[in-house]
Amino acid sequence: MNRVWFVTGAARGMGVSIVNAALQQGDRVVATGRNMDKLRQIFSTVAAENIALLELDVRDEHQAKVAVDAAVRRFGRIDVLVNNAGFCLLGRFEEATAEQIELQFATNVFGTANVLRAVLPVMRQQRSGRIINTSSIAGVKAVANATFYSASKFAVEGMTLALADEVTPLGIHVTAIEPGFFRTEFLSNSSAHYGEKKIEDYADFGDARELLASADGQQQGDPAKLAQVVCQMVEMENPPQQLLIGNDAISYVMPSLEARIKEIREFAALSNTTDFD
């Protein structure tokens, strides 16, 4: 069956690759983003009957509802939602301002929720749908120098898992994808944000901009292959609720998961001391 995809953050990075992969397999796509000129440029060769380009700042709940309504008017349904819009705030906990923290959560967490609230009534009426929320390895094992990005992705993980339990009985499958490092502009100066405060006590441990600048353009992950993984997952009868993507993702996360299990067992006796006598 040809599906209708609704993709946020479609004007760059993994969003572009996911849109292209869906189109290549004969599906139709609603590609959304804040920069309409960029969307038109990227997808200028796509036949008009296969794509709809819509302006969407996910932080705007009303705009999310308007975009979803327009998508349904155009294609009649939404089979796959990919919540891909987001950015990374880099820097240590104390280096970020309150305004920067709020913007990180407004985009990565509340923006995801805004689009979900707009799309879920459509999928409930259909009694079917696939939702892909873009998390990160930072949502499984927190990354130093990306404190609030990690926190935002932990929030996405919790939201995804709870939502999956709520809507799976309605025929809607929800997955958090947890990519490692992929070769996109995600770490570039045009995309990443940095904490505005500089604290001398941390100087000897390196600067987030310097630490990650050397990795930009050298990431081993291929976003086109990630998009193929997403397409395969959409075809699964019982997709995972969480999916690590990338060899580096598994190698990064597994030691922390094993350490957590070890810690739980080590302190189980202390944990079990709180029941009434």
Task: Mark where each language-model region is.
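Conserved glycine-rich Rossmann-like NAD(P)H-binding loop of the short-chain dehydrogenase/reductase
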Residues: Q25-R40
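Residue(s) in the substrate-gating loop at a strand-loop-helix junction
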Residues: S136
